[in-house]
Amino acid sequence: MQMAQVPALSPDGAGRPIDLDAARALLAPLSAQERLSWAQNTFGAGFALTTSFGIQSAVLLHMASELTAITGRPIPVVWVDTGYLPRETYQYAERLVEQLQLQLVVAQSAMSPARMEALHGRLWETDQPGDLALYHRIRKVEPLDRALTDLAVTCWASGVRGSQTDHRKAMEPLDAVRQRWSLRPLLSWSKRDVYYYMEEHKLPQHPLFEQGYSTVGDWHSSAPDLGDVSGRATRFGGLQQECGIHLPGLMGEGI
């Protein structure tokens, strides 16, 4: 049986190893809410959520908010603000933070957008995979990893779904990513599941949803669905669908 090397922290702070195979077997039949509850009970103060405040982000944030109401233990929500998000995303974030009473932690690159462009140019315009990898490392992966380190996070949950990309289709509910546990409560959810959950709980849609966007990231690399091109295939003109945050390599290696 595989024994993972990343330590888990119990609620009282005592370190203990996680048996990855056993944890996956335990998580497989659980609902998304039950997976979140398991993670909070297992990792205690070392558990956090990440969010992009994108089209489907409200679902996991709402679940975390409801769990906090039950347990009385707020879950930190880490948001990577690249400095290039659409105005609508910033407005949507403010609305959800207020409505769901989120404990928000904003992570930003130590390098301002202006400085990055002065030193490296507009990396998203070159259509070069290496430039996109550098962009994602500077603006997304490094800020996230720094924030998780500052918060002493040992497990973070995200809203990735298996149907979004080929890479995500092969994911497990729990994996080790860059020396931390990565939990995917919504991995088996469909777009329909997301939509009906938001309708049932009267969660607001991202303003760009009504303009035909099924996913939204930075303003310069997101587009509404068009014909056969939809979802994350609209990112960076279809050149790249993963930003490195959910990839196992150090600081986005292999993006």
Model-found features: residue ranges?
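Nucleotide-activated chemistry modules centered on ATP-dependent adenylation/adenylyltransferase
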Residues: 2-255
